[in-house]
């Protein structure tokens, strides 16, 4: 029997496994969503009117929350390794334990979500029949499945009067996007950015624009993705259009930009699975990347740069939400607000190391770094000073959100962008 490798230290796993596995799952989910329409969306009568005006939202919130009370229990569904852990005992989650001590709410925490597609398929029958899914709180990926949950009435509208910490400490870049319907149903859990990663030693200059990925000097040295959702949205940015407000005419213009890039021989490959290693090996010099890819690679010895181009980059967000059938929604809402305390957000960020949606967690991590030693101190200092975890105000101003697509638009979108990498 071959020897098993020694497990990496907890702090190192945070730089590799969590970041890789979570984003890998998102890539798989985005691909699945782009390739096939959601079965639930074709269920006759399944869609429900979504509150749009302030009065409609207030009425929906009142209807759901009136008479609801704390019950002292909470069932929480999440992705694997996507919350803080005790460095000495990976099965323990200190912030959950502290939450129980403070509130008396006992938490049943399960890492049962593998990807958006399989999770939706697992719980959709229960939702459709009006039954509980067994969870009061869940993390949903920021992909094309999320709007479907909202349209089908599967998420509870949030009572923001009970979320004072979110109001006070939630970063402005993470609020009120059309993709999440203005936080009516969700608040961010963790986030990340999509931009350009490049090797300055290979490129020989700074990259500042999506147009730099049309530079003839980079022929055969650019990496792009076989992911219609991300590819189409960044191409919209490249042609100067905010994805959230884009039209079908804008999509055609973006697809033309991508075809120009492809036909000029600039792209070595379209892949969401190999671009990281290709960039580190020097097979490609510049690529579409997630911000965390560069943070991870540089902690491992690479000297890559990440840039949010002047035309803008994408901010993606995984979201906390409450199922409309939750048995303990007040307890879930209590935890939502608790997670937005800077000291709690800091502890979670120190483990998962994604973009933190609570900017005031940054000085907390800096203080924790001062109190730590060795590798732990080095890690926490890197986290507290990295614009890949705490984006600068200038970078935040350039971040945009994904375009929300209805069922008809999704088919039109895929018809334009999938052939770019399939042909």
Model-inferred region functions:
Residues 42-49:
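Bacterial lipoprotein signal-peptidase II cleavage site
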Residues 323-396:
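Mature extracytoplasmic/periplasmic domains
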Residues 57-144:
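Early extracytoplasmic/lumenal segment of secretory-pathway proteins
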Residues 65, 131-138, 156-195, 221:
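A structural signal for short loop-to-beta-strand junctions that line the ligand-binding cleft
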Residues 149-157, 181-183, 296-308, 375:
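Ligand-binding "clamshell"
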Residues 146-147, 223-227, 231, 235, ...:
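Ligand-binding pocket segment of bilobal, Venus flytrap-like solute-binding proteins
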Residues 388-423:
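Conserved C-terminal helix/tail region of periplasmic/extracytoplasmic solute-binding proteins
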């Amino acid at each position: 029997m071959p020897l098993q490798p020694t497990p990496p230290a907890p702090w190192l796993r945070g730089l590799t496994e969590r970041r890789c596995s979570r984003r890998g799952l998102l890539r798989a989910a985005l691909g699945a969503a782009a390739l096939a329409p959601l079965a639930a969306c074709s269920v006759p009568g399944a869609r429900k009117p979504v509150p749009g005006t302030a009065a409609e939202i207030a009425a929906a919130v009142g209807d759901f929350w009136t008479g609801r009370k704390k019950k002292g229990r909470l069932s929480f569904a999440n992705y694997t390794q996507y919350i803080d852990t005790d460095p000495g005992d990976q099965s323990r989650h200190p912030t959950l334990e502290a939450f129980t001590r403070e509130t008396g709410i006992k938490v049943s925490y399960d890492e049962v979500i593998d990807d958006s597609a399989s999770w939706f398929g697992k719980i959709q029958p229960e939702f459709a029949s009006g039954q509980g899914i067994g969870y009061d709180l869940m993390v949903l990926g920021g992909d094309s499945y999320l709007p479907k949950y909202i349209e089908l009435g599967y998420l509870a509208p949030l009572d923001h009067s009970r979320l004072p910490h979110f109001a006070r400490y939630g970063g402005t870049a993470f609020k009120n996007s059309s993709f999440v319907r203005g936080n009516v149903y969700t608040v961010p859990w963790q986030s990340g950015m999509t931009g350009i990663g490049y090797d300055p030693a290979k490129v020989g200059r700074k990259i500042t624009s999506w147009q730099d990925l049309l530079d003839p000097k980079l022929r055969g040295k650019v990496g792009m993705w076989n992911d219609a959702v991300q590819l189409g949205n960044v191409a919209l940015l490249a042609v100067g259009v905010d994805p959230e407000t884009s039209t079908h005419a804008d999509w055609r213009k973006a697809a033309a930009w991508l075809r120009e890039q492809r036909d000029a021989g600039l792209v070595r490959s379209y892949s969401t699975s190999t671009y990281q290693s290709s960039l580190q090996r020097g097979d490609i010099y510049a690529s579409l990347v997630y911000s965390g890819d560069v943070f991870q690679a540089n902690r491992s010895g690479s000297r890559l740069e990440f840039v949010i181009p002047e035309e803008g980059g994408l901010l993606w967000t995984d979201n906390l939400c409450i199922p409309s059938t939750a048995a303990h929604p007040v307890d879930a809402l209590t935890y939502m607000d608790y997670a937005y305390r800077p000291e709690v957000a800091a502890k979670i960020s120190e483990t998962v190391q994604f973009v933190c949606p609570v900017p005031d967690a940054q000085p907390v991590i800096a203080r924790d770094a001062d109190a730590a030693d060795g590798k732990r101190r080095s890690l926490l200092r890197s986290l507290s000073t990295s614009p890949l975890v705490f984006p600068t105000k200038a970078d935040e101003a350039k971040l945009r959100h994904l375009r929300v697509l209805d069922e008809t638009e999704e088919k039109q979108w895929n018809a334009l962008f999938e052939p770019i990498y399939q042909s």
